[in-house]
Structure formats: structure tokens, C-alpha cells
Amino acid sequence: MILLLAGTSDARALAVQVKKAGYDVTATVVTDNAAIELQRAEVKVKIGRLTKEDMTDFINEHGVKAIVDASHPFAEEASKNAIGAAAETAIPYIRYERASQAFTYDNMTMVSTYEEAAEVAAEKKGVIMLTTGSKTLQVFTEKLLPLSDVRLVARMLPRLDNMEKCQQLGLPQKNIIAIQGPFTKEFDRALYKQYGVTVMVTKESGKVGSVDKKVEAAKELGLDIIMIGRPKIEYGTVYSTFEEVVHALVNQTRS
């Protein structure tokens, strides 16, 4: 069996590809919605966040031969847990990650953390749109909501827990954009104009995450961009295509 951390839409497509290559695959996802397309493709699914101990137990109980970590580029804890579990059980760890993109824009500020992004946003002021999801929303609400010269607008997935979190953090309903992509450049541009955005905050999650569309639209309107770089994790070899992952599995799981 292969344990595959499927934290993104392309990761779930990878799980299907690995199954088609003849492997018994169990994919891990965090939400019920993420499990649906995998279940339709008859891929076994385990729902919920796994600790290192959870992964280690699963590996031992099910005779897992390798971990394929296709979690989101910013799912730092999940990757560290997978690396630790693979090391503890002496099985191969294979990392799949969306290819990075290089952007050139005078009004783009690169930062390393969400906290740093919030600091820069506070300095820039104006109408700030977050496209970084709900997980780290509190970092921005604590820093930006008290400022009278800042309007904080947050775009996130239309999930009940996200709306509840916005309410708990005091983000006004009129400043919540609950919607699911992917989005075109034209859509992003219209959204920026509708809200009068002056600063867009995003993270370098790759082309599949439509970061390029967000950036292109922002550049056309002359907006300031704050880009959060990917976490620095020692993955070892990183593969960016499905074919490379399957080839690595073939080479590393031979008896």
C-alpha cells in the first residue's frame, strides 16, 4: 500500500494516477468535500488531520511501502509529520510539489511569514484583500482590524467553519468573499475593482493554485502585492510531475 497525502486538487489527481499505475493507494484528506472525487475514482480515503504517531500506526497496521507527500506547499506540519513517520518506519518518503513561479513586479514585497505579511500590510494601509485562506486569518485580523485606515477583505472557501471563524474574529460580513475557484484573471481583476482593493496578499502556492492569475490582475491595476514565500523544509528530492512520482515509486518500492 501507498499512503498519499492529498491536500490539493492536483494531489488528488495524482492519487488517481498512482492507482492507475497498479498501486494500492490510501489518500488522506482533511475535509469530506475533498474526499468525494477520490471516492468516485474508487481510491480509498482517510479523512482527518494525521499526527506523526497516527501516520506511524497506519503504516505499521497496513504494511505501507512508501509515503507520497502531495500536501499543500504551505502544509508545513503535515510534511514534517510525514517525513518523521517515514524515517521512523524506514520506508521511502517521496515529495510531490507544484512547481514554483518567479514573478517580476516593482510593487511586490516578498515576505517569509504571515506575521511579516500583516506587518507590511499595516504599513501600506488602504483596502487589503487576503487570498491566503482562513487558517491564518487571525494573524491579519489582530493586526489590521483595529486600524482605522485599513479595510480588510478576506476571500476564502464557502465553508460553514470559515464563516464561523470570521464571525468569531470580528470580520464584518460585507468584507467576506466566500467562493471557490479556480478563477480567471478577468474575474480577479473585477473583484479587485469591485472592492477598491489597493493591496493584495497571497502566497506562492504555484500555478495550479492560480497565483499567476491573481498577480497578473493585480499588476494590471497597479496594486501593491504582498507575497508569502514557501516554508523552507528539507524534503530531499522533490518531484513536480506525476510521471516522476510514479517512476520514483517503481524504483523505491521494489522488493
UniProtKB/Swiss-Prot annotation:
Q: Does the keyword Kinase apply?
A: no
EC number from the UniProt entry: 1.3.1.106
In terms of PROSITE patterns, this protein maps to:
COBK_CBIJ
Q: What are the protein's UniProt keywords?
A: Cobalamin biosynthesis, NAD, Oxidoreductase
What Pfam families does this protein's entry cite? CbiJ
Q: Which domain of life is it from?
A: Bacteria
Task: Tell whether tRNA-binding is among the UniProt keywords.
Answer: no
Q: Which reaction does it catalyse?
A: Co-precorrin-6B + NAD(+) = Co-precorrin-6A + NADH + H(+)
Q: In which pathway does it act?
A: Cofactor biosynthesis; adenosylcobalamin biosynthesis; cob(II)yrinate a,c-diamide from sirohydrochlorin (anaerobic route): step 7/10
Q: Which GO terms describe its biological process?
A: cobalamin biosynthetic process
UniProt GO MF annotations: precorrin-6A reductase activity
What is known about what this protein does? Catalyzes the reduction of the macrocycle of cobalt-precorrin-6A to cobalt-precorrin-6B.
Q: Which family does it belong to?
A: Belongs to the precorrin-6x reductase family.
What protein does this entry describe?
Cobalt-precorrin-6A reductase
